[in-house]
């Protein structure tokens, strides 16, 4: 499904996509196109792209092809989704302790749309940290 979404092939392209967008949230999935977790996330991203196009834009970045941000954003997971608004990284508190990114595959489309809407509303108000609509601290039931 990753072929349905725009890929960024250089660090410069990533920077320009973040800088160029003034009114919409920039959602970037960093990862490997061949990874199973990425494929699951890409499927959700592709399915919501049309719904959220008025307030968010989605890009994909292969961290092997574009390693520029791996250290800066600690991109060690197979799939990582990050949010940017007006050239600023927007953090999201998901209850997991890591407020910088979503590093697992969300399987529910509406759940992801809710997260994007929440991040967008918070970013428009000038917030750098947004509280997620759902607590993911117990996403794994032990």
Swiss-Prot record:
InterPro entries: Dim1, Thioredoxin-like_sf. Pfam families: DIM1. Expressed in roots, leaves, stems, cauline leaves and flowers. One of its GO terms (cellular component) is U4/U6 x U5 tri-snRNP complex. Signal peptide: none annotated. GO terms for biological process: mRNA splicing, via spliceosome. Belongs to the DIM1 family. This is Thioredoxin-like protein YLS8. It comes from Arabidopsis thaliana (Mouse-ear cress).
């Amino acid at each position: 499904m990753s072929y349905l979404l725009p890929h960024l092939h250089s660090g410069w392209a990533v920077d320009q996509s973040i800088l160029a967008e003034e009114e919409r949230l920039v959602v970037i999935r960093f990862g490997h196109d061949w990874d199973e977790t990425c494929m699951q996330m890409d499927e959700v991203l592709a399915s919501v792209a049309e719904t959220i196009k008025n307030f968010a834009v989605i890009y994909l970045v292969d961290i092997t092809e574009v390693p520029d941000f791996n250290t800066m954003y600690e991109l060690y997971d197979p799939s990582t989704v990050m949010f940017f608004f007006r050239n600023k990284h927007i953090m999201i508190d998901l209850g997991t302790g890591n407020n910088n990114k979503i590093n697992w595959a969300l399987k529910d489309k509406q759940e992801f749309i809710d997260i994007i809407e929440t991040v967008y509303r918070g970013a428009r108000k000038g917030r750098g940290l947004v509280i997620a609509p759902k607590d993911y601290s117990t996403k794994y039931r032990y």
